């Protein structure tokens, strides 16, 4: 019964019309192009992002910070996300263009609970930023998120290294560059799909 309730309350990103970043990144790597990832906080921003990306025929990653998610409410964000996909299709049709792939991504999530909640409410990709933790703890937390996310075909971005400053409520006084040797171990032990690194 509890499993049935869990499935009933979960909204898959596929129901909202999003894709995960796995195939998106593979095509970009093969084609030699970059994919824009934009954080949005209001209707005007998301409209501008969708129109620009449709008209340039660019795949896009719509990013939501943990702060923006708290502000907007996760239920409302589902409808905003779904609306963005529908707007994309309508604008593409109006302009005689192809629909574009769109991903909905949690930017700088810092807990398993937040990542899980986003996965259950229609996000197709999540970032778990445990870079402020010791290396082994970062591996452990990232692996936990990856194991849950991959059950639902959601992609995960990890982070290694720290940039000084404040980004999405994550603050650091000093920069720590990413050690390439750590990257090999981190990716192998977490099975993460993509990785944010600190190179200056």
Predicted regions and their residues:
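Short, Lys/Arg-enriched N-terminal segments with co-localized hydrophobic residues
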Residues: 1-9
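N-terminal amphipathic/basic leader segments beginning at the initiator methionine
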Residues: 10-28
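Short, contiguous strand/loop micro-motifs
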Residues: 11-12, 36-37, 101-102, 132-133, ...
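A short N-terminal beta->alpha junction/helix N-cap motif
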Residues: 12, 33-41, 68-69
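Alpha/beta enzyme core
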Residues: 21-27, 43-68, 74-91, 95, ...
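A short helix-to-beta-strand connector/capping loop
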Residues: 33, 98-101, 152-154
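Short catalytic-loop micro-motif centered on adjacent basic/acidic residues
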Residues: 35-39, 104-105, 127
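Aromatic/His-enriched, Gly/Pro-containing loop or helix-boundary segments
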Residues: 100, 104, 108
């Amino acid at each position: 019964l509890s499993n049935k309730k869990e499935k009933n309350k979960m909204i898959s990103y596929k129901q909202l019309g999003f894709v995960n970043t796995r195939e998106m990144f593979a095509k970009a790597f093969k084609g030699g192009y970059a994919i824009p990832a934009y954080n949005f906080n209001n209707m005007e921003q998301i409209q501008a992002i969708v129109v620009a990306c449709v008209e340039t025929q660019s795949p896009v990653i719509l990013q939501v910070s943990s702060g923006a998610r708290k502000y907007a409410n996760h239920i409302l964000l589902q409808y905003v996300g779904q609306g963005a996909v529908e707007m994309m299709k309508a604008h593409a049709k109006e302009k005689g263009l192809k629909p574009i792939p769109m991903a909905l991504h949690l930017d700088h999530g810092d807990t398993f609970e937040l990542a899980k909640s986003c996965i259950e409410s229609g996000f197709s990709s999540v970032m778990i930023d445990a870079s402020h933790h010791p290396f082994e703890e970062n591996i452990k937390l990232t692996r936990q998120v990856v194991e849950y996310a991959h059950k639902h075909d959601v992609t995960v971005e990890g982070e290694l290294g720290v940039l000084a400053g404040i980004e999405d409520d994550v603050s650091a006084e000093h920069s720590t560059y990413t050690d390439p040797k750590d990257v090999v171990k981190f990716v192998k032990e977490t099975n993460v799909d993509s990785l944010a690194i600190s190179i200056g």
